[in-house]
């Protein structure tokens, strides 16, 4: 029996943990206020996996859930205190070789003023703030309309 490899990421109201076990069977996930226990049989050889995690902060076990797919089991843990950042998943600072941060899904939501806004909306908003309005009065720049010679118009000295 060994722990299943897992990836995790943090959101404003939830913490997500994905246990990477293909063809899992007999999946058992137990949510407690400050602990998560995961077990299953995985792969073609029905290898037994067991993970016990003492969580960094408390969760709401009644509002936490999991979903099994052919490739993994995704656990959605409802935070006990919404909006509280989790710098790590576990209570202990020890590095666990089976646990890593899911940087593909990681988002620095603390600096994000509107989490629900889609990427397209952000792009559209950014484009709206770009130039292109003809009614905008731009400040005068000295020499912008001059036809005088610039320093790059001068002849370069020959190389020796």
UniProtKB/Swiss-Prot annotation:
One of its GO terms (cellular component) is protein folding chaperone complex. There is a cross-link at residues 35, 65 (Glycyl lysine isopeptide (Lys-Gly) (interchain with G-Cter in SUMO2)). Keywords: Acetylation, Cytoplasm, Fatty acid biosynthesis, Fatty acid metabolism, Isomerase, Isopeptide bond, Lipid biosynthesis, Lipid metabolism, Phosphoprotein, Prostaglandin biosynthesis, Prostaglandin metabolism, Ubl conjugation. Residues 118-160 are annotated as: Disordered. Residues 122-132 have a biased composition (Basic and acidic residues). Coiled coil: none annotated. Induction: In brain, by LPS. Widely expressed with highest levels in testis. The keyword Chaperone does not apply. Pathway: Lipid metabolism; prostaglandin biosynthesis. One of its GO terms (molecular function) is protein-folding chaperone binding. CDD domains: p23. It catalyses: prostaglandin H2 = prostaglandin E2. Probably forms a complex composed of chaperones HSP90 and HSP70, co-chaperones STIP1/HOP, CDC37, PPP5C, PTGES3/p23, TSC1 and client protein TSC2. Binds to the progesterone receptor. Interacts with TERT; the interaction, together with HSP90AA1, is required for correct assembly and stabilization of the telomerase holoenzyme complex. Interacts (via PXLE motif) with EGLN1/PHD2, recruiting EGLN1/PHD2 to the HSP90 pathway to facilitate HIF alpha proteins hydroxylation. Interacts with HSP90AA1, FLCN, FNIP1 and FNIP2. Belongs to the p23/wos2 family. This is Prostaglandin E synthase 3. The lineage of its organism: Eukaryota, Metazoa, Chordata, Craniata, Vertebrata.
């Amino acid at each position: 029996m060994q722990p299943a490899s897992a990836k995790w990421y943090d959101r404003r109201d939830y913490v997500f943990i994905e246990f990477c076990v293909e063809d899992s069977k007999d999946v058992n996930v137990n949510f407690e206020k400050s602990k998560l226990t995961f077990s299953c049989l995985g792969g073609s050889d029905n290898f037994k996996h067991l993970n016990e995690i003492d969580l960094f902060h408390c969760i709401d076990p009644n509002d936490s859930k999991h979903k099994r797919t052919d490739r993994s089991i995704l656990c959605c843990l409802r935070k006990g205190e919404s909006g509280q950042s989790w710098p790590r998943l576990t209570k202990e600072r020890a590095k666990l070789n089976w646990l890593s941060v899911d940087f593909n899904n990681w988002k620095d939501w603390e600096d994000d003023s509107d989490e629900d806004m889609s990427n397209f909306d952000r792009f559209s908003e950014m484009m709206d703030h770009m130039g292109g309005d003809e009614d905008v009065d731009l400040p005068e720049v000295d020499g912008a309309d001059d036809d005088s010679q610039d320093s790059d118009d001068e002849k370069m000295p020959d190389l020796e």
